[in-house]
């Protein structure tokens, strides 16, 4: 599919991009090649192909769900500059 100059300008407008008029032929060429490639991919017969969640057929190696650290809430509360009712107080940032 070959794009026209007006197509590139419209795409740039939709994307809120400012493109120099001198660069439009370059973008026209590149975008046309991308669309041709997408067209080639659309022609591939995927009738008996099972959809995949991930392109790599790998299994995630997850660690066992075990507690690895103890609760240090009291320790962190004791060293905080200001605490009230169990929450950390910070200086006012916005008026």
Swiss-Prot record:
GO biological-process terms attached to the record: glutaminyl-tRNAGln biosynthesis via transamidation; regulation of translational fidelity; translation
Asked whether the keyword Protease is assigned, the reply is no
Q: Which reaction is this enzyme known to catalyze?
A: L-glutamyl-tRNA(Gln) + L-glutamine + ATP + H2O = L-glutaminyl-tRNA(Gln) + L-glutamate + ADP + phosphate + H(+); L-aspartyl-tRNA(Asn) + L-glutamine + ATP + H2O = L-asparaginyl-tRNA(Asn) + L-glutamate + ADP + phosphate + 2 H(+)
Give the top-rank taxon of the lineage listed in the UniProt record for this protein.
Bacteria
Please give the positions of the paired cysteines in each disulfide bond. none
Q: What InterPro entries does this protein's entry cite?
A: Asp/Glu-ADT_sf_sub_c, GatC
So what EC number does this one have?
6.3.5.-
* Alphabetically ordered keywords of this record: ATP-binding, Ligase, Nucleotide-binding, Protein biosynthesis
Q: Which SUPFAM superfamilies match?
A: Glu-tRNAGln amidotransferase C subunit (SSF141000)
Query: Pfam families, alphabetically?
Result: GatC
Q: Which GO terms describe its molecular function?
A: asparaginyl-tRNA synthase (glutamine-hydrolyzing) activity; ATP binding; glutaminyl-tRNA synthase (glutamine-hydrolyzing) activity
Tell me yes or no: is rRNA-binding among this UniProt entry's keywords.
no
Its family remark reads: Belongs to the GatC family.
This protein's assembly is summarised as:
Heterotrimer of A, B and C subunits.
Main function? Allows the formation of correctly charged Asn-tRNA(Asn) or Gln-tRNA(Gln) through the transamidation of misacylated Asp-tRNA(Asn) or Glu-tRNA(Gln) in organisms which lack either or both of asparaginyl-tRNA or glutaminyl-tRNA synthetases. The reaction takes place in the presence of glutamine and ATP through an activated phospho-Asp-tRNA(Asn) or phospho-Glu-tRNA(Gln).
Q: What is the protein name stated in its UniProt record?
A: Aspartyl/glutamyl-tRNA(Asn/Gln) amidotransferase subunit C
Q: What species was this sequence derived from?
A: Nitrosococcus oceani (strain ATCC 19707 / BCRC 17464 / JCM 30415 / NCIMB 11848 / C-107)
